[in-house]
Amino acid sequence: MRVVVLYGQMSQKKSVDEQDGLVQVESVANALSALNHDPVPVSFSLDVKKTLQLLSSIQPSVVFNLVESIDGRGHLIHLAPSILDAMNLPYTGAGTDAIYTTSNKVLAKQLLRGARIPTPAFVTPEDVGRKQLPLFKPCIIKSVWEHGSVGIDADSVVFPKTSEQLTLEMSQRRYQLGGACFAEAFVEGREFNLSLLAQNNDNTPQVLPLAEICFENYSRDQYRIVDYKAKWESESFEYQNTVRTFDFPAQDRPLLAKIQKIGKECWKVFKLKGYARVDFRVDASGNPWVLEVNANPCIAPDSGFVAAAHKAGLSFQHLIGRILYGPIMQFEDRCFPESDTFSWKIAVNE
């Protein structure tokens, strides 16, 4: 079966996180080959017409969507599934709406609030001057659109004394955060990642083993956050001292159950498909707070999602097969409407 492995066009600088995306593409393509499929890597560029023509000429049975940004810009991520929808092409992972609502962190937090799912309080630069702002001490300045801890560093946690000072902090940091940012109440405490994998029969998520990120050897004046260094710079203190664990004492069972329940609620609220990851902080009182909902999280071999899959007994190849066959099962025995460019039927076993 011909499978397009779609990924976003890289920016000219090709940052470390973008380079990791290329590792992800190669690894997925190799797994597809091992599953006796014909993978065709395709870069999704801002030249949408060219991308359309290329996809039309390849005529894949399904698209493995690995687009995380386009030309280094996270706010364009929803263009890929939108184009695939317009072409009636089945693709892996979340749909257009879910990609858009989860990639816009402010919108995602508004939806979480509407669903009464706990998420830390936040303000945007646009809120300043329009209403009385609560001042969070401390708070963390985050990007609206960029993921993978882009722009997050040790100075991202701030203690604003006035709304003007908070506005200044956001203004000074917004460029390194992709141009749009917001301030979120910083939750002191533990950090957890919950990975969810669709079960092909009805898209009900399988909850993979819960992971905690442990901050080892951090001094008292260091904020325990998974910043850019902790995620991407392998020689840094932060990277080497943020350790993932799947082992928990018995007294954590009620907390883990609560986190799993909230994670499954997020799956429903955002209408997720395929695979997702929900990031949590847990405060000193044991209350979980949703930081982010990640549709189509990184599935490079060294990623947290793959580590959770391995803990559940799934090999990388098995994981890729599970993700791939979700859209195939949904499109089985279904013919695409004829168009000026192409028409074909999905075959589960070619």
Specify the residue positions occupied by each region the protein language model found:
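Hydrophobic beta-strand scaffold residues
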Residues: 39, 90-91, 119, 139, ...
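Active-site nucleotide/adenylate-binding loops and adjacent lid/helix of ATP-dependent enzymes
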Residues: 1-8, 26, 56-57, 101-190, ...
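A short glycine-rich, hydrophobically flanked beta-strand micro-motif that places a catalytic Asp/Glu
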Residues: 44, 181-185, 192-193, 271-285
